[in-house]
Regions:
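C-terminal boundary motif of the adenylate-forming
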Residues: 252, 290-315
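Conserved A3 ("GATE") glycine/threonine-rich loop of ANL adenylate-forming enzymes
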Residues: 77, 156-164, 177-192, 206-208, ...
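Active-site loops of AMP-binding adenylate-forming
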Residues: 159-160, 169-174, 181-200, 233-236, ...
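Hydrophobic alpha-helical segments in the ANL/AMP-binding
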Residues: 35-49, 164-166, 170-171, 187-191
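Adenylate-forming
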Residues: 4-8, 14, 82-86, 153, 226, 259-288, 317-338, ...
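Conserved ATP-binding/catalytic segment of the ANL
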Residues: 205-272, 289
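Conserved AMP-binding/adenylation subdomain of ANL enzymes
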Residues: 6-25, 32-139, 149
Length: 352
């Protein structure tokens, strides 16, 4: 059950944490059935922002270059693909271009992660150097994405790799990492504009949300944006809330210095045959930053080892096979090729 009172409270809380305004151009490409996208669209409408609806998710990057949005709700997989694409382009550039890019990236990381993220005053020399590399290098990277004037880019829905999060901030895009559920009307916590944040956290609670960590380490919620329950499901409702009225999220986490850190989805934990628990999301996120990997599912339940089912990025893999003179009749034959498997195994070893 999601009530209008919950929506009103969510709009008030989010407006203070991530203040979009009437000058923003918000592009929507996630399904509106997804409470994250719907809530972000409502927030934009509530302040008079311009909404740009992209009806073809696969063409989102082209749409961004055409419409130049200042804001967009996205899932981590979108930014993982951006990260991989930019790195690939840089690796194929000249030595001079590559050195310039990585120097600019390091300056951006130092300024935006080591100082701004921690709420520290940026030294004048670093600020001047950042303005120079931002204008000459980083702005060109953002232009390729259609993000010449980035404002707020909330990201949630899955585990965000710290490597990807640092990269996005380093090129000058304000990624707002958050955490939420349908039952909480999306946002529970997020990085707050103008406040310090920690890479790897999912931010601070929005106004009105009370977070409690149970003795078992589960994240428990109470507040005006939390569902009153499930429609006509008395048994489920009795299990969904504790005696103090806190909602069971099913996610494990902890609080540190006012920020929430996720550990894993409790129900998604695997237990190997030797008794070790494995959190698949972190392993999957680590693998997904590789350009050869499109999708991955970690498998470990009741096995002595951790395995992964990988769907390759076939356009990249097929190009690599041609460059390495590997003949194949179809994708199945390509995946079974010994040299392909050796190459993938080496890349996975490097990622670990």
């Amino acid at each position: 059950i999601l009530t209008y009172t919950m929506y009103h409270a969510a709009m008030e809380g989010n407006t203070k944490s991530v203040p979009v305004n009437s000058k923003d151009r918000i592009i929507n490409f996630l399904p509106f059935s997804h409470v994250f996208e719907r809530g972000w669209a409502y927030l934009g409408l509530s302040v008079g922002a311009e909404l740009i609806v992209n009806t073809y998710p696969k063409e989102i990057q082209q749409s961004m270059r055409e419409t130049h949005p200042t804001s967009m709700a996205a899932v981590p997989r979108f930014w993982e693909k951006v990260y991989v694409a930019v790195k690939e382009r840089m690796e194929n550039s000249s030595i001079v271009q590559r050195k310039l890019f990585y120097h600019a990236l390091n300056v951006g990381r130092k300024r935006n992660i080591q100082y701004v993220a921690r709420g520290k005053r940026v030294p004048l020399t670093l600020e001047m150097e950042y303005k120079f590399v931002n204008k000459t290098v980083l702005s060109l990277v953002r232009k390729q994405l259609g993000l010449e004037d980035p404002h707020i880019f909330p990201t949630a829905g899955a585990y965000v790799s710290p490597e990807v999060e640092e990269f996005v901030h380093s090129i000058g895009i304000n990624m707002i990492v958050g955490y939420g559920l349908t039952e909480s009307l999306a946002t529970v916590s997020c990085d707050h504009i103008g406040q310090p944040y920690t890479v790897g956290s999912v931010g601070r609670p929005i106004e009105g949300i009370d977070i409690k960590i149970s003795d078992e380490g589960e994240i428990m919620l109470k507040g005006p944006t939390i569902t009153p329950g499930y429609f006509r499901r008395d048994t489920t409702n009795a299990e969904a809330f504790d005696k103090d009225g806190y909602f069971h999220t099913g996610d494990a986490g902890y609080m540190k210095d006012g920020e929430l850190f996720l550990k894993e989805r409790i129900k998604d934990l695997f237990k190997t045959s030797n008794g070790k628990y494995i959190a698949p999301q972190m392993v999957e996120a680590m693998l997904l930053v590789d350009k050869f990997i499109e999708q991955v599912s970690v498998i470990a339940d009741q096995r002595k080892f951790v395995a992964a089912l990988i769907v390759p990025e076939f356009s990249v893999l097929e190009e690599w096979a041609k460059e390495n003179h590997i003949e194949f009749k179809n994708r199945e034959e390509l995946c079974q090729n010994k040299r392909v498997n050796e190459m993938m195994r080496e890349r996975i070893e490097t990622l670990q």
